[in-house]
Amino acid sequence: MDTMTNSTIAQQFFDSYTRALLDRDAKAIAEHYAVPALIEFPDHPIAVSEVSQTEQFFSGAFGQYDGVSTTHATIRIVAETGHSIWADVTWTHDAGVPSERLLYQLVRSGSDWRIAVLTPLDT
C-alpha cells in the first residue's frame, strides 16, 4: 500500500522539477507536464497539445533566469483529491531575480504526477 502523503508527493515532484529548471533542460522540464495541459500566463495562455510546445515555451524563457544558480520552492498544498494536488508554490531565486508565485495543478498520470495547469499568482 502506498503511504506517501500528498505533501511528500509534491515535495518530491518539485525537487525533481527544480533540478530540471536549474539545469535549463527544456526536455526534462516538459516531462513534468501532462499533455494536454494549460499554461495560463496573462495575455499569453498556452493550450498544450504536444510536448514540444512546453519545451519551446521554457527554452524561450531561460534568458529571464540568467545568473540564477539556486532557487528554493516553498510549497503549500491548497487542495487535494485522489487524482489531483493543487500546490501554491513560491520560488525564491538568487542573483537578484524576483520571486515568483505560481499555482500548479498536479494530476496523476499512471504512477507519476504531472502538471496539468500552471497559473501565476501575485507575490
PLM ranges: what are they?
Residues 88, 99-123:
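Short beta-strand edge/turn micro-motifs at domain boundaries
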Residues 33, 91-93, 119-120:
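Short beta-strand segments enriched in hydrophobic/aromatic residues
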Residues 2, 9, 38-41, 52-97:
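Surface-exposed, charged secondary-structure patches
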Residues 29, 76-78, 105:
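Short secondary-structure boundary/capping segments
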Residues 44-47:
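Short glycine-enriched, charge-decorated loop/helix-capping segments at active-site entrances
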Residues 13, 25, 57-58, 73, ...:
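Hydrophobic alpha-helical segments typical of transmembrane helices
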Residues 1-35, 51-52:
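Short, low-complexity N-terminal intrinsically disordered segments enriched in polar/charged residues
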